[in-house]
């Protein structure tokens, strides 16, 4: 199960309205995020949030991408309009030979 699939499943279990907003560009053969920083758009009880879903090992790199001079103006505009941005990092953890569990680390993107 991919990080995006895990995130969607969790959001829906929590009662959020959630949809994948990244798309496949068949010409370039790459996935393109919404505004270069969003995989999932969710409406939750706390408000609207764009989620970048990844493995925990990629969280720092995704945060750097969002804060880059190319992406940050769009992300900042989203934040100023009242939206939230979160990077959800998933890991599969557990001792060898034991049952593995998915763990989630959520990092909130804030201005500054």
Predicted feature locations:
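Catalytic phosphate/metal-binding cores of nucleic-acid and nucleotide-processing enzymes, i.e., regions
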Residues: 1-112
